[in-house]
Amino acid sequence: MLAKLSADSLVKIPRYQALFGKKPLNKKDQEEVSQIISSVDQSFPNRAEGVKFLSERAWEYVSEGKLDTATYRFNLVHALDSTSVEAYWGLGVVAFQRLDFPGAIELLGKGLQINPKLSIMRVDYAIVKLSCYLKNLDCGNLEEVDALLSQALQEDPSNANAWMKKSQVAFLQEKYELAWSYFHECRALDLTQLDLNFSQQLMEKMPDPQGIFK
C-alpha cells in the first residue's frame, strides 16, 4: 500500500496530524469530533461497522493522494476505537508518504503491537525501514529489513510483495543468486508484484539462472 506522494499544505493543523498531533483538541474541534462519533453511533448497528466504513473511506482518500482528509478520517477511526489497527496502519502509510519515516515507524509499530500477525502491514513496516537505509538514515538497516520480511513470510508465505522486497534486499547485499530465487518466488505467486526495472538491474549483475528473463 505504500507509495510516495507529495506532502500536504495543511499538515501543521492538529486535525490533519496523526492522532490529532497527540494534543488536546480545541473546543470547536472537540465538539465536531463528538458530533461525528454520535452520528456514527446512530447511523450504524454497532460501532465496529462505523469504524469499518470510516476506514474504507479513509483508504480511498489515501489512494487519491488526499492525505489531509485521510489523516482526519483515520483520526476519527482512532477516536471511535483506540485499538483500531486500521487507524495506526493508515496513519503510518500517510506519514511515510509525507516522508516522515520515524513517524511511520512509530505508527506502524503500534499497529503491529495490536495485530502482530498482519503480514501485509509488516511488509509496509519493512519498506519504511528499507527507505531509511536507502536514504542513509539511521532508522533502518538491511539486516533489520530482511528479518522483518522473513517474519512476514512466516505469517503468510503467499505474500508476493514480501518476496519481491526480499529479492531487493538480497541484491543490495550482493547476494545475486539468492535475489533471483526470491524474484522467481514472487513471479510464481503474483506477476503484478514483479518490479521489471529491478530485474534489469539484477541481470546486469547476474544472468537469470532459470533463463526466463533475458
Regions found by a protein language model. Name each.
Residues 71, 105, 139, 146, ...:
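Conserved positions within tetratricopeptide repeat
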Residues 59-63, 85-161:
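Alpha-helical adaptor scaffolds
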Residues 44-79:
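Alpha-helical segment of the N-proximal tetratricopeptide repeat
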Residues 41-44, 78, 112, 153, ...:
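A conserved position within tetratricopeptide repeats
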Residues 2-5, 13, 42, 160-214:
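Terminal, low-structured helical/coil segments at or just beyond the last alpha-helical repeat
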Residues 1-47, 212-214:
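Sec-dependent signal peptide cleavage junction
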